[in-house]
Amino acid sequence: MLDQQTINIIKATVPVLKEHGVTITTTFYKNLFAKHPEVRPLFDMGRQESLEQPKALAMTVLAAAQNIENLPAILPAVKKIAVKHCQAGVAAAHYPIVGQELLGAIKEVLGDAATDDILDAWGKAYGVIADVFIQVEADLYAQAVE
C-alpha cells in the first residue's frame, strides 16, 4: 500500500486534477499514440476525437485521487472499465507504458509545478491502481477461458 506522505501528496493534487485533468489526459493520449502506435487498435478513435475518452480517463484518475485512502470504493468502476479493457485486448504489459506516458503528460502539462515529489507519488499511486486493474482483468480473462 501507499505510505502516508504519498497519500497526502495525491490528495493535495485533487484541485489540480479538477482544473487540468482533461488537458493531462488529452496530452497523455496524444503522446501515447505518437510513441506507441501499436496500442492504437485498442482504442475507439471516435471517442478520442470527441474527447469522450480523455474526459472519462480524467474522471477515473480524479476518482482514484479522491479515494486514494479507500481504493475499494472505486472497485465497481474499475470492474466496468476492466470489462471494456478485456474486450479490447488490453494486457498487463500495457500498464507500464501507460504509466510512463501518464507521468510524462503530468510533467508536460504542469511544468515546474509537477515536482519530483508529485511525480514520485503519482508513480507509486499509479502502480497500486494498475495492479488492481491487472488483477481484475486477469480474473476476467481466466473466467472467459473456463
From Swiss-Prot:
PROSITE patterns the UniProt entry points to: GLOBIN (PS01033)
Span of domain Globin: 1-138
Keyword Transport: yes
Keywords from the named record: Heme, Iron, Metal-binding, Oxygen transport, Transport
GO BP annotations, alphabetical order: cellular response to nitrosative stress; nitric oxide catabolic process
Keyword Iron: yes
Molecular functions per Gene Ontology: FAD binding; heme binding; metal ion binding; nitric oxide dioxygenase NAD(P)H activity; oxygen binding; oxygen carrier activity
Residues engaged in binding heme b: 53, 85
Superkingdom, taxonomy of origin: Bacteria
Function recorded in the entry: This protein functions as a terminal oxidase.
Subunit record text: Homodimer.
PANTHER family from the UniProt entry: FLAVOHEMOPROTEIN (PTHR43396:SF3)
Family: Belongs to the globin family.
Protein's UniProt name: Bacterial hemoglobin
Source species of the chain: Vitreoscilla stercoraria
